[in-house]
């Protein structure tokens, strides 16, 4: 499939560096892909982006702050057991170096740099929460919203299992082999036996993510931002 494609670039947006990539023609309808917790823009597979672009969209994917080749920030530590218990049973969020609203502003600032007034927003998991923040705070910038495997933050909604929370929030490994093994394990859990598995594809995705650069401390900060977020309904 042949579509217009601009290689990754870095923009100064909201005071930080945001690495982004564009598929599709300049005059096409803009569509922004926002990845989830600790995820990188390349987890929106190239073929997926090309297919959307071939349908008449200008696809913008990017690394959130603290992931991939975007700016690495500072502050925040691994959540303590006490902090986790307060979140789980008292709905008291931990302190966070930045919020999902800050990450929403990153997205809007990137669109400003690109000269895009409004776009379709597509977010997965934490990315869906960011997309919701954009729709609430900057409604005039949103043509449509697609929220994938995400939440509004309402504590009355069904919650993830303790096992899922434990696996997804455990410290990110620094070694390549352990990172790949954890990546494959987590995606197997997220599929929950409902979607076909492709071990070779999962491995290639994990290798690409690791080789672009992982940031365990950044994942911890993103976890705090997610837990800090109040319900938007």
Segments from the language model and where they lie:
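Flexible "cap/lid" loop of the alpha/beta hydrolase fold
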Residues: 132, 136, 143-174
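Conserved acidic catalytic loop of the alpha/beta-hydrolase fold
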Residues: 88-97, 101-119
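Short beta-strand immediately N-terminal to the catalytic nucleophile in serine-hydrolase-like folds
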Residues: 103, 121-123, 148
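A domain-start/cap signature at the N-terminus of enzymes
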Residues: 1-11
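Alpha/beta-hydrolase
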Residues: 160-231
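Gly/Ala-rich beta-loop-alpha elbow adjacent to hydrolase catalytic centers
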Residues: 123, 127, 131
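Conserved HGGG/HGGXW glycine-rich cap/lid loop of the alpha/beta-hydrolase fold
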Residues: 12-90
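Residue in the alpha/beta-hydrolase core beta-strand immediately N-terminal to the catalytic nucleophile
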Residues: 63, 120, 144-146
């Amino acid at each position: 499939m042949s579509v217009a494609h601009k290689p990754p670039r870095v923009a100064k947006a909201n005071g930080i560096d945001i690495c982004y990539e564009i598929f599709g023609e300049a005059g096409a309808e803009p569509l922004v892909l926002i990845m989830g917790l600790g995820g990188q823009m390349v987890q929106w597979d190239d073929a997926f982006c090309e297919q959307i672009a071939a349908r008449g969209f200008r696809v913008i994917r990017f690394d959130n702050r603290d992931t991939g080749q975007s700016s690495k920030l500072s502050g925040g530590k691994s959540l303590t057991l006490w902090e986790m218990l307060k979140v789980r049973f008292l709905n008291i969020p931990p302190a966070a170096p930045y919020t999902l609203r800050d990450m929403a502003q990153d997205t809007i600032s990137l669109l400003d740099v690109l000269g895009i007034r409004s776009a379709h927003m597509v977010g997965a998991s934490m990315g869906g929460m960011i997309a919701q923040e954009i729709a609430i705070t900057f409604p005039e910038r949103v043509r449509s919203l697609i929220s994938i495997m995400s939440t509004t933050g309402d504590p009355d909604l069904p919650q993830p299992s303790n096992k899922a929370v434990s696996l997804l929030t455990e410290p990110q490994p620094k070694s390549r082999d352990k990172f790949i093994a954890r990546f494959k394990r987590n995606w197997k859990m997220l599929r929950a036996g409902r979607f076909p598995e492709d071990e070779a594809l999962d491995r290639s995705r994990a290798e690409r993510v690791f080789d672009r650069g992982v940031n365990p401390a950044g994942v911890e900060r993103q976890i705090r931002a997610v837990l800090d977020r109040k319900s938007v309904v």
